[in-house]
Amino acid sequence: MSDLHTATENVLIDERVRGFPPGNPPLPLDAIGKQGWKPYDGRMALPLISLDRQAFSGNVELMMAYVKSHGAEIAPHAKTPMSTALAEALLAAGAWGTTVADIRQAAVLLKAGQRRLILANEIGGAAAACRLAALLGHYPDAELHIFVDSTALVDALRTAWQERADLPPLGLLVEFGAGRAGARGVDAAEAILEAILAAETPAFRLTGIAAYEGAAATADAQETMRRIDALMAVTSDFLPKLRVRIGDERPLLVTAGGSVFFDLVIARLSAAVAADPACRLVLRSGAIFFHDHGIYERGLAGLDARGGFRIGGETVSAATAFRPALRVWAEVLSRPEARLAICGMGMRDVAMDQGLPRPLVLYRNGAYFADLESAEVFRLNDQHAFVALADGSDVAVGDVIEYGISHPCTCLDRHAILYGLDPDHSVTAAYLTSFG
């Protein structure tokens, strides 16, 4: 619902949105958390997506403590929830800024009042540079740092900034890459650096180096480590090269770090950043605050195996300390076979690119009924989930199943509202999303 994307807390929500009870009078967003609804009590329209607010808060506290203990900063990636309220909550918890993936996402955050952004992506050519300039012309107090991996993009941005006098300063981050965008090697990065320095003005400046190690991952764990090590090494080694060209006093950023290999970023880049008093290391992890029952569950198990999650000199199990905060709730529509249930949830409602949803708990008649340890989703259609059941299962039509998900980034984008739950699963908040 695109009309929600510029909404305030006073926007009226109705049954056009997943979860909202059919026939209920429209409600302001901030009233939804006062109705006493529960996803399994029969009132809410299913499927819907929910956020365990306690788990989310715990994940935020844990990640902020981790970053602080390593002398780093974090600009959480807003592409995961695209919720301005949750982005503001992360800033209030100590985030240095916010990361976005494109110009539209930047517009969402700027309109919400945020001013320090990392645009962690290349944006295209001259037309895209003009679109970015058109946006930032409305926000003269913005601080935006953007990835660049070609002289063509540097030239396009330079031209756009030369043509207008009403733009805030633009910070350029030379991106090194492996597997996706980013300069391949020092020679390419030096050409980009020279193009930036030749065009510098007070409003158009080099502000650091960037990388994204997650794109370097492959199916082979050892090859993944080799590729990430190489990417971090070239990123780290380039910092003193910048200092030779620009001097020691200019503040610089070194930014990397998703939600799976951020421990390697800390381990490989911290020393170089610590040796530079005017430099700060900024992670961009976003999905970590939501965690999941799939790709990030596996990712944090890998982090633990590397012995990488250390806070204040102590090793903590990331796999147990972080808690999955997202659930999708769906009703059983059919029991056509003894070992099969069909549920009202499909590809339009839940992610499937990094694993299928996981049945967790069964509810019946508005109350907890049983854990679903042996049930498994094995296929999704547009609107249906195929759930394999154990022999003798008494899952019944009308039961509600609580599912864990895999990959928050491609699950949340299907939903206009994320329902915040308290520990007894009552809805106590509602968060608008702005996925366009």
What does each of the following model-derived ranges do?
Residues E337-G436:
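C-terminal accessory subdomain/extension
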Residues A75-A221:
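Active-site-proximal beta-alpha core segment in soluble small-molecule metabolic enzymes
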Residues M1-A134, Y431-G436:
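A charged N-terminal "starter" segment
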Residues A72-E73, V244-L253, V397, L412-H415:
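Flexible, glycine/charged-enriched surface loops at secondary-structure junctions
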Residues F262-R364:
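Active-site loop ensemble at the mouth of alpha/beta enzyme cores that anchors a bound cofactor
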Residues Q162, L167, G177-R310:
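Active-site loop/helix belt of alpha/beta enzymes
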Residues F56, K79, L109, V174, ...:
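Conserved, mostly hydrophobic/aromatic
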